Amino acid sequence: MADVAKVAVESPLPHLDRLFDFSIPEALDADALPGCRVRVRFHGRLVNGWIIERGPTEFDGALQPLQRVSGPPVLTDEVLGLCRRVADRYAGTFTDVLRFAVPSRVAAVEGRPPQPPASTPAATDMGVWAPYGLPDQGVSTWICHPHDDPFDMLARAAVDTVARGGGAVLVVPDARDVRRLHAAVSALCDPELVAVVSAEASNRVRYRTHLQILDGSRRIVIGTRSAVFAPVTDLALIAVWDDGDDVLVEPQTPGWHAREVAALRAWQVRARLIVGGYTRTAATAQWLVDGTAADVRLSREAARERRYRVDALVEPDADRRRIPARAFAVVRSGLEQGPVLVQVPRAGAATGLICAQCSHPIRCSRCGGGVRPDRAGRPRCRLCHELAHACASCGAHDFVGVGAGSRRSAEELQKAFPAVAIIRSDADSGVLDTIDARPAIVVATPGSEPRVPGGYAALLVLDTDVLLARSALRAREEAARRWMAAVAVTSDEATTMLVAPQDLPVVQALVRNDLASLAEMDRQERAQAHMPPAFRCVRLRGTSSAVSEWLAAYSGEVLGPLETTDGSEALLLSPRDRASGMLHDVQRIQADRSKAGRPPVEVRVDPVDLGEG
């Protein structure tokens, strides 16, 4: 019996997430290979699909023939298997994931002869990793010292991997990071070995780059989140930098996180995985508890020798002001040496609540989630929707909103330092990549800090309560990540001043240079609340009737449903060791509802914005 093509049809409908058999016309037989795009007639319409395999069919009727084969194979078996695992991990469909793994076809760039292979680099000096004790294999969760260069370190790991005969994929959050990492790698090896995968590139460039990676001429891939799917030959190293940045989460269905995809892929091909940042996430702290990752950070001796100075202060209640006198002193002293960085949160309405008595962020007494005013102005948890009645720290009942912006900060600082240049770097005024080393005050929002040769002479972090009072499960983790990113652009001798209560765990972690303990504290608190990463969580969103109908078909642990401004929301929870059953049930219910034509319910697994509203 002649082979048939088993095709995954591109469709958003969950009940069509399976393979369909199509006959192969003789004229297409030589071209109809696994990994090829095809056009097929499906339910009376011409649609796109992918040949996943060829083989015999169990169907005894007449099959629809393939209509067209669109180009050469561009989907490898390894990436195909990865897409299936990611779909199952995020309760999505195979083709929903596949669209991120392979760029759209541009026929004009096909058929070009492969480039001659670039010269294999010599083994590079890995001495920068020596104080960290990086293992030669397995999974590593890495806390980088803020005054080390993580891009040089990752570049060296990648080039060393290629020198040993392997390939490498390096994933970073944004285009600025891509440029820095590309420069670091290109300084160590032939740039022709390197491919850049970025959403900023045109589709023509992205498709040409994909073909170059496929033919093996590009051994190191650098890019933003979708680069994690790049079909690198002999993949031996995957690295994800700054995994706490939520831009590593794909906003479209099914909402995968590049860190989790990297972990699935590293397990699948037995590649080494390095996940790092200036801080550690609760997710990778969970890997340490599970025994699946190595703890990579400076040795105790090296950390003692290279302490970075972080201080915290809060003015006495009677003299409380937004920029305390001691903070002005830090700025004044820093200006004698060079530019000073002032980090402020983005402007806007109140993003959370703090205690009017002691300034501690208000958090839910039931689940630990952030609290913010609801539509009626009542202090309500955005995670479990309980009302908050008292500050957990001092018992006071009066709460105040928090919120501030870079423009107001710049105006205050200009009044205090009229002879000093004030530079803003933010989304409103424009983000600067670099400035020179002349004395100036740079007011920047998180992620917009320009770099300066030699680093800033001082750092002042204002309005810390805004980040800490965010109504998100990850508020403390995110605050530490943003503040440490600012510390990383200071000089070795700089002082960092946080205007924040000194007894807050996140502040103490920075003061003590101990980000590992903070990550473990976050992990433990979330485990007690049955929240990720110790538990898998699925968030359902839809109309009230659709969510209620969906839940009627489900028998596991549920929080909710609760009414929201847009309809209804519920959370499904499961211990991780039983999560595969929950996710399978979610896929089954979604498929059943799709087949029956029921109203859609949005599904998100382990959403990073849990608790926000």
Question: Which sequence ranges carry the predicted segments?
Answer:
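C-terminal boundary of histidine-terminating zinc-finger modules
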Residues: 307-331
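Conserved RecA-like helicase motor-core motifs
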Residues: 189-201, 365-366, 374, 418-428, ...
